Amino acid sequence: MKLNEKQLQQVDAQVKRLLKSGSFYGEVYRKAGISGVSSQEDFEKLPFSSKDDLRNAYPLGIQAVPEEEVVRIHSSSGTTGKPVIIPYTAKDVDDWAIMFARCYETAGITNKDRIQITPAYGLWTAGIGFQLGA
């Protein structure tokens, strides 16, 4: 994926914020020798996270904002191991709704259609996105 200059600046700002916060991802980047992202080459050096990385951060080790900014907490089911707990800010929830709305639009769904959300999602991470995007 080729990033434009604005995207590189946005990624750089996020990486620097995470490094400053000492969060889970800040530590991942620090250990990988990442100090910022100013080029496509820098972007391509960003490490991936595995499911085990996220499980090892249980319960709220991936939280990168102050507690008072967390408005929802969702979880994976934990059926294949320790659940992954994901805290969301209000902006995260809004962005998630927009992303799902775009998915519905791409699928050809309009305001004349009805959507049935069948999973018993409870705290399932994607459940609220399905609901809010509708």
Label each PLM-derived region with a short phrase.
Residues 105-134:
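Conserved AMP-binding loop of ANL adenylate-forming enzymes
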